[in-house]
């Protein structure tokens, strides 16, 4: 590797990782409430320790969620079905401490209620709904993969997803739910990926498994198929370092081995460290929370900019004040990769094409639906196994037209 080249890494985790277990429980509860009342206001956190879960937060909804049942259903779907794997969904403890959302917060978010909202015009609704909190959010896109995601995090997610697939299908026996992946890619001085350097997989397994057997099976059934799918002939991967369970056995996993908490994998959830992060987590939050909806909207904006060929990569920063509809600021950073246009022209086109008020985002991306559980593992962006509305590139022509009209 030359001095101008650099190594960039990103990690992912499987759905059985204790933090991801908590994310999925929080989003399963959110989905259940949105399915009954699309205007539900939800902010639900989950924490996990050995044999016990605490679900807490604030909810205002016409719906009702049986939290105990939802926790156990989620755990069963992940694969925590017996004490042998470290957790039994049917016998673990579940403590619920959910209260109603603060009226002071609600008054800034929902100024129109009932008949007022029904009678209001779209513009009146968009102006009436302020941001659910202050904060800064980021969205990112790059043309180094077909999904317009950074290669390290995209590859790490694909490995984690396929690791779970072969566990659930039985293609590789003796695997248990907890697991992590990590990928290191070499980039050249033009910031292009040129070589796979390292693949790391740590996976929970049954006691009778040897590490040598596991390394062979994972290479055959997980690593090789994913590398062929994602890298193909585009990025050399014939001389990389493979690490499987580098500390040795990994029998005890999940919440039995480590405490879990909603919102503790925010870099895994987004861009693997390739972009900035405002710090706000996603899971358990309804779309009135701009931590979530604005992060989705900025990904949508960034992806359309790159898909339109205006820049090779772009990061969008947006900021809000609680109770105020219009963003405090919107910044476009193209890292010097803009193509035939200036950064200022792109920023002006974004302001013309995208309405980034919270209610407008919710309407445009149709976010008042039970779509969030599927986001809670393997990344919120750049997915190929499920379609999310913020991944659409429906504003490409409008952006080009806005640029041409300047």
From Swiss-Prot:
Residues annotated for Mg(2+) binding in this entry: 19
Keywords: ATP-binding, Cytoplasm, Magnesium, Metal-binding, Nucleotide-binding, One-carbon metabolism, Potassium, Transferase
Residues involved in L-methionine binding: 58, 101, 258, 289
Nucleotide-binding is among the record's keywords: yes
Classification lineage: Bacteria, Bacillati, Actinomycetota, Actinomycetes, Bifidobacteriales
Entry-linked InterPro entries: ADOMET_SYNTHASE_CS, S-AdoMet_synt_C, S-AdoMet_synt_central, S-AdoMet_synt_N, S-AdoMet_synthetase, S-AdoMet_synthetase_sfam
EC class (word): transferase
Domain of life, per lineage: Bacteria
Pathway assigned in UniProt: Amino-acid biosynthesis; S-adenosyl-L-methionine biosynthesis; S-adenosyl-L-methionine from L-methionine: step 1/1
Catalytic activity as recorded in UniProt: L-methionine + ATP + H2O = S-adenosyl-L-methionine + phosphate + diphosphate
GO biological process, one term: one-carbon metabolic process
Cofactor note: Binds 2 divalent ions per subunit.
Enzyme Commission number, as recorded: 2.5.1.6
Protein name: S-adenosylmethionine synthase
Annotated spans, Flexible loop: 101-111
GO MF annotation list: ATP binding; magnesium ion binding; methionine adenosyltransferase activity
Role this protein plays: Catalyzes the formation of S-adenosylmethionine (AdoMet) from methionine and ATP. The overall synthetic reaction is composed of two sequential steps, AdoMet formation and the subsequent tripolyphosphate hydrolysis which occurs prior to release of AdoMet from the enzyme.
Family: Belongs to the AdoMet synthase family.
């Amino acid at each position: 590797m030359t001095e101008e080249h650099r190594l960039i890494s990103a990690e992912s985790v499987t759905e059985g990782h204790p933090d991801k277990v908590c994310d999925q429980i929080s989003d399963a509860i959110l989905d259940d409430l949105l399915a009954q009342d699309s205007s539900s206001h939800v902010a639900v956190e989950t924490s996990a320790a050995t044999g016990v879960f605490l679900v807490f937060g604030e909810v205002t909804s016409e719906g009702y969620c049986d939290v105990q049942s939802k926790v156990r259903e989620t755990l069963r779907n992940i694969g925590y079905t017996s004490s042998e794997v470290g957790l039994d969904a049917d016998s673990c403890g579940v403590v619920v401490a959910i209260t109603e959302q603060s009226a002071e917060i609600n008054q800034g978010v929902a100024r129109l209620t009932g008949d007022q909202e029904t009678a209001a015009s779209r513009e009146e609704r968009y102006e009436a709904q302020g941001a659910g909190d202050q904060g800064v959010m980021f969205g990112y896109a790059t043309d180094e993969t077909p999904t317009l995601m950074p290669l390290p995090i995209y590859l790490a997610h694909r490995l984690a997803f396929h690791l779970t697939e072969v566990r659930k299908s039985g293609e590789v026996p003796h695997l248990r739910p907890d697991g992590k992946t990590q990928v290191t890619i070499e980039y050249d001085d033009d910031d292009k990926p040129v070589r796979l350097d390292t693949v790391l997989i740590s996976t929970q397994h049954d006691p009778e498994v040897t590490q040598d057997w596991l390394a062979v099976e994972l290479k055959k059934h997980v690593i090789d198929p994913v590398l062929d799918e994602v890298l193909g002939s585009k990025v050399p991967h014939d001389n990389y370092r493979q690490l499987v369970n580098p500390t040795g056995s990994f029998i005890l996993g999940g919440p039995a081995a480590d405490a879990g908490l909603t919102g503790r994998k925010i870099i895994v959830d987004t861009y693997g460290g390739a972009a900035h992060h405002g710090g706000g987590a996603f899971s358990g939050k309804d779309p009135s929370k701009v931590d979530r909806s604005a992060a989705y909207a900025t990904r949508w904006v960034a992806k359309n900019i790159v898909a339109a060929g205006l820049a090779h990569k772009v990061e969008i920063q947006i900021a809000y004040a609680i109770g105020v509809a219009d963003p405090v600021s919107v910044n476009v950073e193209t890292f010097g990769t803009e193509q035939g246009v200036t950064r200022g022209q792109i920023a002006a086109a974004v302001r013309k094409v995208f309405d980034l008020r919270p209610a407008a985002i919710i309407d445009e991306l149709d976010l008042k639906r039970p779509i969030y559980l599927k986001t809670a593992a393997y990344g919120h962006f750049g997915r190929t196994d499920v379609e999310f509305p913020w991944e659409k590139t429906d504003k490409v022509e409008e952006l080009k037209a806005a640029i041409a009209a300047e």
